[in-house]
Amino acid sequence: MKMKRCRSCGEYTLKEVCPHCGGRTGVIYPPKFSPEDKYGAYRRKLKRELYSRGSGESK
């Protein structure tokens, strides 16, 4: 079991649904570091795409 945090109210819990507000919870731990970084190229590509979309819409 891992500690989770509610995305709506910020309360900590071990459940999938927040007992305080009924909101969704997410794992609070960062992903494990790996020097190989199998998904690094995908993450960088997605970040570039999101950045280019965001800057293009603001003009």
UniProtKB/Swiss-Prot annotation:
GO molecular function annotations of the record: snoRNA binding
GO biological process terms on file: pseudouridine synthesis; rRNA processing
Gene Ontology CC: one annotated term: ribonucleoprotein complex
Matches recorded under InterPro entries: H/ACA_rnp_Nop10, H/ACA_rnp_Nop10_sf, Nop10_arc-typ
Keyword terms: Ribonucleoprotein, Ribosome biogenesis, rRNA processing
One matching Pfam family: Nop10p
Function: Involved in ribosome biogenesis; more specifically in 18S rRNA pseudouridylation and in cleavage of pre-rRNA.
Family to which this protein belongs: Belongs to the NOP10 family.
Name the UniProt record assigns to this protein: Ribosome biogenesis protein Nop10
Organism: Methanothermobacter thermautotrophicus (strain ATCC 29096 / DSM 1053 / JCM 10044 / NBRC 100330 / Delta H) (Methanobacterium thermoautotrophicum)
